[in-house]
A protein has these predicted regions:
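Helix-start/capping segments and mature chain N-termini
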Residues: 1-44, 61, 70-172
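Ordered, amphipathic secondary-structure segments that act as subunit-interaction surfaces
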Residues: 47-59
Length: 172
């Protein structure tokens, strides 16, 4: 998962942790830390950096494959691993770009990974499609990309949420 820290304060850390726990359950991963210990660890990492505005990333991986090939069929036979890092917060676009807007391109060459391939309700880092759509946008002179599903519906933008103002209503 990813959470931001602004002026020394985490943005909705508990909500991010709850989403992370749901994602782990959907992916059959076991977080080696309880929520309180996880929060203490993330706070400690940020404190060690001295950053007041940061991007905090953490994940649980399946871990190395068990030695016995048949054990790969059983999620409980893996030793899941927890990783986290903190880096300075970086805006995707500069203030001037955010004030006037940017040129978005709906990707023609790439679609978002279908939900029957990777459950979109589980936060994951399957991002090759997102990265390729960014390169497509750059090659076309656009500032950023938006992806669709296999039926042409907007899904997401790399590192961004999509909000549409239509007839006075905000859609997401």
């Amino acid at each position: 998962d990813v959470v931001t820290v602004s002026r020394g304060h985490f943005f909705r850390l508990k909500a991010h942790q709850e989403r992370f726990a749901r994602s782990c359950a959907r992916m059959k991963l076991t977080n080696p830390f309880e929520a309180e210990a996880e929060a203490r660890l993330l706070h400690k990492l940020v404190a060690k950096t001295g950053l007041r505005d940061a991007y905090v990333w953490w994940t649980v991986t399946r871990g190395a494959n068990p030695r016995v090939p048949a054990d790969r069929l059983h999620p409980d036979r893996f030793t899941n691993r927890f990783y986290a890092f903190v880096i300075p917060y970086v805006f995707i676009k500069e203030d001037t770009d955010r004030q006037v807007g940017i040129n978005l391109m709906v990707s023609r060459d790439y679609i978002r990974i279908p939900q029957n391939a990777v459950d979109p309700r589980a936060k994951n880092f399957c991002s090759l499609d997102l990265n390729m759509s960014l390169m497509e946008a750059g090659a076309s002179g656009a500032h950023w990309s938006v992806m669709t599903d296999g039926n042409g519906r907007l899904t997401e933008s790399p590192g961004s949420n999509i909000f549409i103002l239509k007839e006075g209503r905000i859609l997401t």
